[in-house]
């Protein structure tokens, strides 16, 4: 199955193998694409984005020095949309998939989220 929080998609990006397509093919009895042991390029991370309060979404702001680490930005809201304070997965407003060159950088930025903000009025 695809899994929650887009885990299969992130692994597909990191390993350059379409795990979701292969899972569907296997489920319906079709031959799957060749799979190999992955060689990961960097240290991959996914951020689940949410608002800290109810309001109107304005923007997602990311520190300029980290923009190059963002592989995929997937916002499910647009400026002007109403958002609710995060209380569960159904309140998420998007995801960021990131790739860092070192494990230390990945862990550093996951432990401190001050490098991005969800602007809400």
PLM regions and their residue ranges:
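Short secondary-structure transition/capping segments
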Residues: 17-32, 71-91, 121
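Glycine-rich active-site loop/lid that clamps phosphate-bearing ligands
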Residues: 49-81
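Generic C-terminus detector
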Residues: 77-121
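Solvent-exposed, flexible loop/coil residues
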Residues: 11-15, 61-64, 104
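A structural signal for short secondary-structure junctions
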Residues: 39-42, 66, 87-91
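Peripheral, non-catalytic segments that deliver or gate enzyme domains
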Residues: 3, 50-58, 88-98
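Active-site "cap" helix and flanking loop/linker of ATP-utilizing ligase/carboxylase catalytic domains
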Residues: 1-55
């Amino acid at each position: 199955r695809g899994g929650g929080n887009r885990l299969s998609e992130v692994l597909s990006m990191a390993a350059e193998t379409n795990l979701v397509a292969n899972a569907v093919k296997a489920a319906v009895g079709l031959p799957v694409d060749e799979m190999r042991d992955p060689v990961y390029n960097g240290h991959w991370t996914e951020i689940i984005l949410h608002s800290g309060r109810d309001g109107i979404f304005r923007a997602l702001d990311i520190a300029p020095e980290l923009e190059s680490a963002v592989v995929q930005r997937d916002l499910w809201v647009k400026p002007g949309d109403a958002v609710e304070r995060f209380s569960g997965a159904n309140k998420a407003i998007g995801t960021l998939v990131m790739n860092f060159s070192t494990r230390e950088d990945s862990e550093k930025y996951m432990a401190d989220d001050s490098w991005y903000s969800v602007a809400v009025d």
